Amino acid sequence: MNYQVTVSGDPELAQESVDFVSSGFGNMSMNVNTTSSHHHHHSNSGNAEVSFNGGFGMPNMTMEVKETHSGHHHHHSNGGNAEISINSGFGMPSMTMSVTDSNSGHHHHHHKESASVNLSLGGIVGAVVGAVTGGVMIDGRNRIWVQLNQSSYVGGDIISGTIEMDCIVPFFAKGVIVKVKGFERLWLQELRTETEGEGSNKRTVYKTIDHKENKEFFKSTIVVYPQAGTVNCGHYSFPFSYQLPSDLPGTFCHDGKDAMGAYSAKILYKCKATVDVAHKHDLKSTTKLIINEKCGELVQPSFAENKKSFMLTKGKLHVKTWLNKNAYFPGETLVAKMKANNTSIKPTRKISLVVHHTMQLKTRLYHRCITNAIYKQQYDGFQPCFYGKRYLPFSIPVDLKPSSSLGKHITSSYLLELECDIPMAIDLSVTLPLTLFAPQFLYSTVPSQPPGTPLPPDVSYRHPWEGDEHATACRKCNKGFSLFARKHHCRHCMKIFCDKCTSTKTTITKLAYPKPVRVCEECYPIATQGGNKYQSAKLMAAQYQASLNAYYAQYASLYPQIYPDQQQQQQQPSAPPQQY
């Protein structure tokens, strides 16, 4: 039997179905099993079951056909009707179609028969295409990714980039979209101890309570290509842009556990590129955005100072500390400049730089503050009566979490503490704020400076302190020291004399002695004029400049693209200006 099928409906949807089938997804096969009976001059009925087997992963579909017709003897015209019900196994609505067939009756002979089938499809083809594409997995060789114009952003910046796609195996797509979002997510575990019952039934119960908070900063969908159709083999680029809201908190992600319970704190920003195919089988790729807090007025030199007196010893210790900036990247090296004026005879055994990290985690019903000293680096101390400058290099660990202070539920902050370890006394500490940006490992392929760039030299304005253990007699009168003949240091030359030879006192302005101090008879005339410095800061700065120029000259020869003008003119860059 031959069937002539005519389809009426949306031609574009029909064409999409043809394109879909012709794109290499597979073939359909149809099996028809019919049973019928007829007898001379009697009405007859027959049933047919038609099954469609999809060769490309779609579920099977069955169709039941019920037909009735009357048969006549000896070549009379016959008429019959058929009602066909189609049940799909993949989400299509059921549909029916009517079949009218006309054939010539026969007796003991078989003749060619024909049937005309009219299908009014309308949206049926679209439903078939949608259901089939929803069930098809995208070939794993097809790729999509996000290419951004910057490695990091701050609130208010415009994110610009392209969606790059490589198509190896063609497929049908509805469009290309980009989703950008930023959110804050906090989970806190509270370990609570409660007492239940009374009297002899009183008991202690340990409970674990979970606290959760979520806040969405922004969420947007950008349609970069709205047209539907078959994606052929090749490479595609779709540009897009999006302006971030201002005053966004910095990227932060940290999970941990302490005595109060576990916690998970996340401030994340994501950019997701999607080729809209259907349902869960979209071709997609997600890229995390690095957002730093806007800090136009934050990056500036940082300064702090502190001083202390001693209970049983005259004099004070006054320490000033500078940072040329207070915002750094993990892995970067900061240099802390310290200027100390110790007018006492107390030495400082060692100097330490300690990084303290503080997290504030807040939910509606629970709050936790977590503070830890996460990194410490030690340096040599200084002698009694030290007056001078020290430069302390400090390499920031790469695994430190970034700062984030604008979140509603999560804040992360750092402090850099300089500690002076003083024997038999409370330590002196100076605290500086420290901001860490989110790490950027790809922002430059060339190092900003060659490794091992020389540091500014340490400067000591006063002479080195002479140790008591080697002095047995006065340097001038040779009087031996004993329990009753005590040792005294001249505050100008720092040598040891007896009490009589250091009986004169005067201020020494150039050595930061504003009050009268002991000096020997030889140093007294110079001390009254302000004194002489042990080392000249200007002379040492000139020597440092020369060594730095030589070092940068070597750097310019290795990386001429950084200093093209100096390379052409054979001039070397000067030392960076001292901002502190």
Swiss-Prot record:
Residues 31-54, 67-86, 95-114 are annotated as: Disordered. Keywords: Glycoprotein, Membrane, Metal-binding, Transmembrane, Transmembrane helix, Zinc, Zinc-finger. It is a single-pass membrane protein. InterPro entries: Arrestin-like_C, Arrestin-like_N, Arrestin_C-like, Arrestin_domain-protein, Ig_E-set, Znf_FYVE, Znf_FYVE-rel, Znf_FYVE_PHD. One of its GO terms (cellular component) is macropinosome. SMART domains: Arrestin_C (SM01017), FYVE (SM00064). Glycans are attached at residues 27, 33, 60, 149, 341-342. GO terms for biological process: cellular hyperosmotic response; cellular response to heat; cellular response to oxidative stress; protein transport; regulation of cellular response to stress. The chain crosses the membrane at residues 118-138. GO terms for molecular function: phosphatidylinositol-3-phosphate binding; zinc ion binding. Zn(2+) 1 binds at residues 474, 477, 498, 501. A zinc finger (FYVE-type) spans 468-528. It is found in: Membrane. Belongs to the arrestin family. PANTHER family: ARRESTIN DOMAIN CONTAINING PROTEIN (PTHR11188), ARRESTIN DOMAIN-CONTAINING PROTEIN A (PTHR11188:SF169). This is Arrestin domain-containing protein A. The gene is adcA.
